[in-house]
């Protein structure tokens, strides 16, 4: 599991805020260093609403803290999320919320892309990023990663202009960072993937063990 100290949240947030965000023009060239956003230039961020997968009135809520650059997160999405969806989400027993964690600028770029198509497409884009993580992260340069992310966006039906607008939206970037910082601090997140199941913090674990926790929460609802 990819671990980070709680104190890292503040440091990571500061670093992300001043990092150069990719313009990702059609040539897939990131914005030059001189165009980097500074903390003073960034607007005040606000906490964005959660994007729910499943029925809003499902009795049990599962929150996952995940990073798009975390291999264990990708493994959960490839192996266990389909089981969770089939057995609990699609049957109305559980609603699922993914909250993005940003370890680095690349993870932030991917997080912006996931939100770029709107809330209705968030989980579809997230699935593309997680299932294709080894492919789009397998790059020698940031230019290559930029190009790979653009391919993911195009596969999700986004235009180059749409992606550029999202990556250059200072307010959205500030909001995503504020959302990450607020939730991760409140839930004392120490690594990814981490889960909060009806208020109980749960670490990444085999499916059979997670299933026991979910079933116990459902039984407690009566």
Which role fits each region the language model picked out?
Residues 2-3, 9-104, 177, 181, ...:
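Extracytoplasmic thiol/disulfide redox context detector
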Residues 2-7, 24-34, 67, 151-222:
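C-terminal cap of thioredoxin/glutaredoxin-like
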Residues 18, 132-135, 170-173:
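A short structural micro-motif
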Residues 32-45, 140, 144-149, 200:
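Periplasmic c-type cytochrome electron-transfer domains
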Residues 56, 89-91, 121, 187-190:
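Extracellular/periplasmic catalytic domains that process cell-envelope and extracellular macromolecules
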């Amino acid at each position: 599991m990819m671990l980070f100290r709680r104190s890292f949240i503040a440091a990571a947030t500061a670093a992300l805020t001043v990092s150069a965000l990719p313009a990702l023009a059609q040539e897939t060239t990131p914005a030059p260093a001189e165009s980097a956003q500074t903390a003073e230039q960034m607007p005040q961020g606000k906490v964005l609403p959660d994007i729910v997968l499943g029925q809003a009135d499902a009795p049990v809520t599962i929150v996952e803290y995940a990073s798009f650059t975390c291999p264990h997160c990708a493994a959960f999405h490839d192996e266990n999320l389909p089981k969770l969806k089939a057995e609990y989400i699609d049957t109305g027993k559980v609603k699922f919320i993914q909250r993005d964690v940003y370890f680095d600028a690349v993870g932030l770029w991917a997080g912006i892309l996931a939100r770029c198509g709107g809330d209705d497409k968030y989980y579809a884009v997230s699935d593309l990023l997680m299932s294709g993580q080894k492919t789009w992260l397998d790059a020698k340069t940031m230019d290559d990663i930029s190009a790979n992310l653009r391919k993911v966006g195009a596969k999700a039906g986004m235009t180059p202009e749409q992606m550029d607008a999202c990556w250059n939206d200072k307010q959205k970037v500030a909001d995503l960072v504020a959302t990450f910082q607020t939730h991760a601090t409140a839930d004392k997140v120490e690594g990814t993937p981490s889960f909060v199941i009806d208020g109980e913090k749960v670490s990444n674990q085999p499916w059979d063990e997670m299933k026991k926790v979910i079933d116990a929460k459902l039984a407690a609802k009566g």
